[in-house]
Design a protein with these regions (language model features):
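C-terminal beta-strand-rich structural cap/linker in extracellular carbohydrate-active enzymes
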Residues: 156-174
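Short, solvent-exposed coil/turn elements at secondary-structure transition points
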Residues: 54, 78, 152-153, 173
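Loop/helix patches that line or flank the sugar-binding groove of alpha-linked glycan CAZymes
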Residues: 1-143, 162-164
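Solvent-exposed beta-hairpin/edge-strand motifs
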Residues: 142-152
Length: 174
């Protein structure tokens, strides 16, 4: 990609790690966590989840890093079961869609409240749409129909309706 400094490389990507404030702690609006992980799993790169983050573990980098690295037994694994299920689903989707791991990236729509891009490889096209606002939005992509990878529903993709803070992933075989 012309915008990419490391063209052809598969770089390691993360939203938090042992050196920075945990993602769930950093977010003022916790509803945005789903967008964060969906972007991590669908953008170019190799996604990495720092242990405990799949369960919404919190940790602030104050005087030292100890709060960022709790004993795994101390992480509340039932805090956000919806987040854990969502990340498991993203793992399965990424494994089943080669375009998400190796495909080219192309921006479709970009604003400060929502965005849509596509990943494409060998006849597989994945549309990734995100709404980070508290308002309903509709994204136009000019495509016939595709399969919603999160629900399995087959639908028309001309207008993708995005409720507040939502993620939609669609596969279009071309």
């Amino acid at each position: 990609q012309p915008w990419c400094l490391y063209t052809g490389k598969h770089l390691f990507s993360f939203v938090d790690n042992h050196d920075v404030v945990r993602a769930y702690t950093a977010l003022q609006n916790k509803d945005k966590i789903f967008n964060m992980y969906a972007i991590l799993y669908t953008m170019p790169g190799i996604p990495c989840i720092y242990y405990g983050s799949e369960c919404a573990a919190e940790g602030d980098k104050s005087d030292n890093d100890y709060k960022l690295r709790p004993c795994i037994d101390d992480v509340d694994k039932n805090k956000r079961p919806d987040l854990l299920r969502f990340i498991q689903k993203l793992n399965a989707i990424r494994r089943s869609c080669r375009a998400l791991s190796y495909g080219r990236y192309e921006k479709c729509v970009l604003s400060n409240k929502y965005m849509c891009y596509k990943r494409e490889l060998d006849g597989e096209r994945i549309y990734c749409a995100f709404n980070i606002s508290g308002e309903n939005v509709t994204v136009r992509v000019e495509e016939a129909e595709g399969t919603d990878l999160l629900t399995g529903e087959v639908r028309n993709l001309n207008d993708i309706y995005l409720p507040p803070y939502s993620v939609k992933l669609f596969r279009k075989n071309i």
